[in-house]
């Protein structure tokens, strides 16, 4: 706003007032207005900035008026440009800007615009000043040319100087003109003094005979001036893009250079005779012209590399390349600059690169190990004591040296150890191609590589290195680790190294402690058979051993994975822990036998290797937050993607939600239950009588799935169960069902039992026809469809849903409901709407919470769920 007012004041002609007075005047007007906003955020820096912009604007106004009122030139349109700028600058309407300004941002924008116009004014002033300076330089050049003596050669020189100025720019032209004027004045004074001396000395000049010789050099110098003129024209054509003219001038330059390269002999006598007594002034001009052309020629030649193309390479050495190719020696980088091919420097370089100079290096190259050199010449970080790569490099070097010594043995029966390097060196010594000092170096190198340790030790190191690179550590078989010695070894006591007092372990496993063999197992090993037993806290340190030595040995020798974790029973957490052994059945038995030999029952009666199966729920006071079984529910009136997992009828089925985050864990749960219940046959069965709603594990073929009891038949001792993850019902013998562990209940039940809304069978009964069943299966089996919950049944309280599928009728795909498709096919009819109630959100939550909250019976070892 301040800047707009400043522009208004400048446009009104407020040039006489100073910027500070103008600013105070504008701010006073601003405070008097009620519609405009106050500049509360304007600090000292902003005030200085506004004052500076007002001062620039004041100067810009004066400059615009001056440029608008300046004399019009016929050569260019400076006056029109200034008038255009002044009209744009004063086109701002301050009153309109003040009326439209409603924020500080708009005021800042006007300040920026004012600064931009000021910068544009400076640019216009600079261009005008530059053009005027160029016109002044042209006038000065005309005055200088008029002041010189008018001769034919002088006019040619002036035209050539003008062309040089055009080619090199105004700056180079000014330098040349100033040099020419100063030199001419000095030459006039010197020539007047030398004329008198030359006239006295040359009493008998022979002008008629020697004058043609004196004219020859002047003609050649004139040719040089013409050459300068052609070069300047060439640069002008290059700037304009005329390639044809440039090529013609280049051909002309080659011819003139060939002429100029010829030797020109100028005698002193011809120069002396060139100055006669009668026409002293006339003969002075060619001499002046020659000196001027020499100066201009030197100046132009300095600029030649910039005007012409890139220079050609200085020198090449074809003979050197031929020698390298014939001798098959790797080429060295050629020098970038060389003075002469026959110079001493080039000869020395060629001699150094000859094949004879590489005789010693070729010999040493055969005994040079590049890989070992790189390892030895590694960085300081790799060779530092704290670097983990240091020990690996030392082992790698020893392995490489051992392999080399093993391959270099010539005759091992006689006990003569002769490496390959010494054998090759002796051959070269016989031929006489290596000097004595060089042989001494190779001998020292071979002595350094001789082994200090036996080959057996190196081989052991080699095996240890390979074992370190494996996924898990392996213990090397030795007589100390034989089974017989292990069985005969004494059991640990209080004075043993593996006793609890001497062990570094505290005896309490606060978290899961596994053997190192666990890292090398794959994901398939997670579903191997598992065996768990109790360990007293007093024996945990003995089983683990010093730094895990005992548990590591048991795991590696029996190929199992051992895990020590906290006990699951609250009353035994402080006294016992659980040891878990995972592997194949034979491997688990082998591990338990070795553990029993190590800890015999006579000395360690508290160690009981009997299996421990944790109860599902110890008592009714158990915290159910971490192991509470839950059901997946459907959102109300919202479509979601589902898959039909089990079909009872066309209107009664089970669905799964494959997009739920927990659905991916179902496959792992099935594999885990198959490995757990398939290998162990001594797991507890369901009690008699079996209560309804108990969670259990039910076998189907070779797999085990989670199920819940629905009805128990006393006569046949059978149980009717419902599978909670895949849906469906089945009648099974009670002896086949097993109690379920608490850790298997953390995953929510994946299947949801639903009914199809709005339809019923055609005959009015509850039995659907085979055609309706086939049609329903064809629409949903193996597909992901959309589902929306619309209510629940009055009788069974089962959720009722609408299923949607995509049908392609022509080009457009439409979404249709299953019930409409069945009715259009004549396989179903409309159901009674009174049997379905649309539930609200609180009622749905209450029903679902009642369905998923488990209840407990008097049988404390099972979970009862109301279905």
Curated annotation (Swiss-Prot):
GO terms for molecular function: RNA binding. Disulfide bonds: none annotated. The chain crosses the membrane at residues 108-128. Residues 186-211, 218-239, 247-275, 298-307, 363-383, 441-458, 481-490 have a biased composition (Basic and acidic residues). Residues 528-595 form the KH domain. Keywords: Membrane, RNA-binding, Transmembrane, Transmembrane helix. Residues 397-408 have a biased composition (Basic residues). Residues 152-162, 336-345, 494-507 have a biased composition (Polar residues). It is a single-pass membrane protein. Residues 145-458, 481-523 are annotated as: Disordered. It is found in: Membrane. Its main location: membrane. Residues 689-747 form the Tudor domain. Pfam families: KH_1 (PF00013), TUDOR (PF00567). InterPro entries: KH-I_AKAP1, KH_dom, KH_dom_type_1, KH_dom_type_1_sf, SNase_OB-fold_sf, Tudor, Tudor_AKAP1, Tudor_domain_containing. GO terms for cellular component: membrane; mitochondrion. PROSITE patterns: KH_TYPE_1, TUDOR. This is KH domain-containing protein akap-1.
